[in-house]
Amino acid sequence: MAMIGDVNRLFKKHSGGRDLSDVPARAFTGFMALAQAINAAGSTDPKAIQKALQNIDIGPETLIVPYKGIKFGKDGQNTKTRGILMQVQNGKYCTVYPFELAACKLKYPMPAIK
């Protein structure tokens, strides 16, 4: 996840100062997996790209999300993903799980909105 700082700086520059949250981080990760598959396919032919995606196996060291990697099962789902939970704390998104990557301590129960 070493690239996340660089990606966040670029995102912040083009998003009005907002930090990267889960949706754009997952979109970036999916786009990078697709780019890798296109390179592996050596073609823009959809069937070649599909085959490359079926065989893709990306390790966690090149991702900006805390997945264990990217590898698609027979159902087309990533078998190496895991949940990432965020809370809004002090007006900003903050990762609270997985605990080993948490940027903020989980607040539970969440305080009432005033």
Task: Describe these PLM feature segments.
Residues M1-K114:
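Extracytosolic ligand-binding ectodomains
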